[in-house]
Amino acid sequence: MASSNLIKQLQERGLVAQVTDEEALAERLAQGPIALYCGFDPTADSLHLGHLVPLLCLKRFQQAGHKPVALVGGATGLIGDPSFKAAERKLNTEETVQEWVDKIRKQVAPFLDFDCGENSAIAANNYDWFGNMNVLTFLRDIGKHFSVNQMINKEAVKQRLNREDEGMSITEFSYNLQQGYDWTCLNTHYYVELQIGGSDQRWNITSEIDLTRRLHQNHVLGLPDPLITNGDGTKFGKTEGGAVWLDPKKTSPYKFYQFWINTADADVYRFLKFFTFMSIEEINALEEEDKNSGKAPRAQYVLAEQVTRLVHGEEGLQAAKRITECLFSGSLSALSEADFEQLAQDGVPMVEMEKGADLMQALVDSELQPSRGQARKTIASNAITINGEKQSDPEYFFKEEDRLFGRFTLLRRGKKNYCLICWK
């Protein structure tokens, strides 16, 4: 992606919500490489899908020759961003936040190149400049440049202040000042001139631009990404089980892959532009192919492969595809113990059982059947498989060979209703 038309290409992909000064940004990019940053607050022990668009934007800029700075908010994470939040965030301990900072830095690292010469990525932590700052310095050097009148009129704050049941503490109110100072420090240390981030960060971005101008007389620029939603208007990146995380221990690669496989037809080509590095021409060609094939679209599988490989690597992708194929075919011989652990984590419903249980009890405990009587009828009708093999004996007791790797037995009722028994 050439630097000269980078912004145009991002706009074509729908990745630009607004540019604070589009003409100035175009002129600056025409002059040569720029340093830019995106902040990631440690509000949990993992990033989630909502962080993926700005993270991939950093990668897109680096591929075009620019220098990305990934800022993890070790200090701002101790405060919490109040923007558009209905209630105040729970304050976490310093030890917890530091642990989350370390995890998030490790998650960010594979997406960027930290050893590629002049545009090598930088990992920064705003605790480095806030950790030893005293309150007098904060108020005199930073606070005096912010107008309370302007701050309370920002929509992100106004929504909270207008609620009778939930106000805003001074702690949260100071978040905007902290984030404003981040850019000033990054501008000083790394000559950062551009910030990218979610469109819900516009208020914070404009405050940072203003503070950097006041303190250093430097003109810096903001490039907010759009808020990603599904075609039906619902929030993107959520499932019935909650957020889709980038940490494989919180959302398994199989579950992650399935999330993308289940993308609606109305969203899939848009998401290919947001979350992959396929060219617009390739995406348009795929859309045309799907339209004329007379078959189920291929786009969801392309999207799932591309994004799962980006986040979990080739090994994670192959495991996800292997599990998917085995569940579809009913043959489990290719599954490894680690694959079964993914299924136990979040792939299919799971129940723990003591050895010695019979099949009818397993169907009831797993909620595949409501009662032993109904379980008996279902087994007799040849609708139950154990590890892919039909079982029609209602009096069947599990054998040692049914316990794969000594730990797992996969039950299926009909074609799609699974439960994994984890033996105690």
From Swiss-Prot:
Enzyme class at the top of the EC tree: ligase
Compartments (UniProt record): Cytoplasm
Record EC number: 6.1.1.1
Residues spanned by motif 'KMSKS' region: 235-239
Catalytic activity line of the entry: tRNA(Tyr) + L-tyrosine + ATP = L-tyrosyl-tRNA(Tyr) + AMP + diphosphate + H(+)
Residue positions binding ATP: K238
Name this polypeptide is given: Tyrosine--tRNA ligase
Organism (species): Shigella flexneri
Name of the gene: tyrS
